[in-house]
From Swiss-Prot:
The lineage of its organism: Bacteria, Bacillati, Bacillota, Bacilli, Bacillales. The keyword Zinc applies. NCBIfam families: adh_fam_1 (TIGR02817). Pfam families: ADH_N, ADH_zinc_N. Keywords: Metal-binding, Oxidoreductase, Zinc. GO terms for molecular function: oxidoreductase activity; zinc ion binding. This is Zinc-type alcohol dehydrogenase-like protein SERP1785. It comes from the Bacteria. The keyword Membrane does not apply. SMART domains: PKS_ER. Coiled coil: none annotated. Belongs to the zinc-containing alcohol dehydrogenase family. Quinone oxidoreductase subfamily.
Length: 336
């Protein structure tokens, strides 16, 4: 089978160091599924992983995937051959930038039947990240009426995570405030369901006042935590929650959180599969809920760009686009 990977980490300005490899098709065992990959989504985590040291070469990236189950392990109980599934995988295994992939069943759910594979591929990683942040970190209720009066600020509402997080938060009853700056990103964020869209290139505190917003219960940062850290501390309500998916690049003063008793959390969606936590089945459960909501018409996919064919050039192009920070929604590559 064909796989696209690299032997050592590289920056894009070094040229295209992706290579095509030919591997034997693996055989599933235990709770593993063998999936014939149809579509993948490329995420910022792919570009970051590409620049990190390679422990075992070649390194095959890729997290989001949609595909058909070809074979199942002898302990699989939730799926059967022929099921169309989607998932986001784990960094400690070969990724989805290959024709066939082994994946454990508790990280997988059946894909929405009303979506094409290139649409469904936009949802697993960002959807899981949003679900974990909203339910596990912020602790919002799964009963929308109980979230009435609660508010959420999403930094970078038009990105992949922000786009699906807006839809999920709106479904579960939160008032959603997002940030965007370009006309197209503002329009996109509104279409995703944002109640208020603020310009992150202008003073957010003043815009809160202009929109009669006294503070928010939750802040979800999906872009440049260092830039927004002090601002988020100022905008969150006392005893509120701040979560980020972007690591600090410089030292920040956690004591700023003290006077308001603010909870600050680094959300890393892969922590469950990486550490084999007892509740790793939540990935399956959250993806299953996403499928149900999509099929019922409550969530929409966030794919905005599709590249046909997985090869070294198309993958390099995808990484270039993501590193330009110009994407709205998600970028998907079709293998079929």
């Amino acid at each position: 089978m064909k796989a696209i990977g690299f032997k050592s980490s590289f920056q894009l300005d070094e040229g295209n160091c992706f290579e095509e490899f030919n591997f034997d098709i693996p055989h599933p065992s235990g709770h593993e599924l063998l999936v014939k990959v149809q579509s993948i989504s490329v995420n910022p985590v792919d570009t970051k992983q590409r620049t990190m040291p390679v422990d075992k070469a070649p390194r095959v990236l890729g997290f989001d995937a949609v595909g058909v189950i070809e074979k199942i392990g002898d302990q699989v109980s939730m799926f059967q051959e022929g099921d169309v599934v989607f998932y986001s995988g784990s960094p400690n295994q070969n990724g989805s930038n290959e024709e066939y992939q082994l994946i454990e069943e508790y990280l997988v759910a059946k894909a929405p039947t009303n979506l094409k594979s290139e649409q469904a591929a936009s949802l697993p990683l960002t959807g899981l990240t949003a679900y974990e942040t909203l339910f596990d970190v912020f602790g919002i209720s799964k009963e929308p009426s109980e979230n009435k009066g609660k508010s959420l600020l999403i930094i970078n509402g038009a990105g992949g995570v922000g786009s699906i997080a807006t839809q999920i938060a709106k479904f579960y009853g939160l008032k959603v405030i997002t940030t965007a700056s370009r006309e197209d990103t503002i329009k996109w964020s509104v279409n995703m369901g944002a109640d208020v869209v603020l310009n992150h290139k202008k003073d957010l505190s003043q815009q809160f006042k202009d929109n009669h917003i006294e503070g928010v219960d939750y802040i979800f940062c999906t872009f440049d935590t260092d830039m927004y850290y002090e601002m988020m501390v100022n905008l969150v309500k006392p005893r509120g929650h701040i979560a980020t998916i972007v690591a600090f690049n410089s030292q920040q003063d956690l004591n700023l959180l003290k006077s308001k008793s603010v909870t600050f959390t680094h959300e890393f969606m892969f922590s469950r599969p990486l550490h084999h936590t007892d509740d790793v089945i939540k990935h399956h459960e959250y993806l299953k809920d996403i499928t149900e909501k999509v099929e019922q018409g409550y969530y929409q996919p966030t794919t905005t760009k599709v590249i046909d064919g997985l090869d070294v050039d198309s993958l390099y192009e995808a990484h270039q686009i993501l590193e330009s920070h110009s994407m709205i929604g998600k970028l998907v590559i079709n293998l079929k």
